[in-house]
Amino acid sequence: MVDWEKVNSVWSAVESDLTAIGQNILLRLFEQYPESQNHFPKFKNKSLGELKDTADIKAQADTVLSALGNIVKKKGSHSQPVKALAATHITTHKIPPHYFTKITTIAVDVLSEMYPSEMNAQVQAAFSGAFKIICSDIEKEYKAANFQG
């Protein structure tokens, strides 16, 4: 059982620095999985150094973390925002579902580095559990849509 309260207690701190945290997460994603950059047309063929402080990466960071925050705040009752997120990523962005697992795993790592006192082992486990459920629910939407990407 996921402790959504623990997740949301840290998420409130995340919201005060959404852009910087999102930038760190996206840049780490691109560093660890360079092929992921190809799914972002504005970021294709650019070095991490070129992307670091651009308006485009900041805007994408806000978009990604705002969407994730909207889901997290639902405390498990997230079917509508998950369906909406999956729909755009299936039809418009065509991003394979395994990238959700990759980015949420990176998010736990980045949050643990940025908030070491708040992100103790129990809170990390709560985040990992929450993200696992969210990613599983997103994957169900992909399967229902018969995604071939």
Swiss-Prot record:
One of its GO terms (biological process) is removal of superoxide radicals. It comes from the Eukaryota. One of its GO terms (molecular function) is heme binding. It holds the Pfam family Globin. The keyword Repressor does not apply. Its EC number is 1.7.-.-, 1.11.1.-. The keyword Oxidoreductase applies. Heme b binds at H89. It is found in: Cytoplasm, Sarcoplasm. It catalyses: Fe(III)-heme b-[protein] + nitric oxide + H2O = Fe(II)-heme b-[protein] + nitrite + 2 H(+); H2O2 + AH2 = A + 2 H2O. One of its GO terms (cellular component) is extracellular exosome. This is Myoglobin. It comes from Mustelus antarcticus. The lineage of its organism: Eukaryota, Metazoa, Chordata, Craniata, Vertebrata.
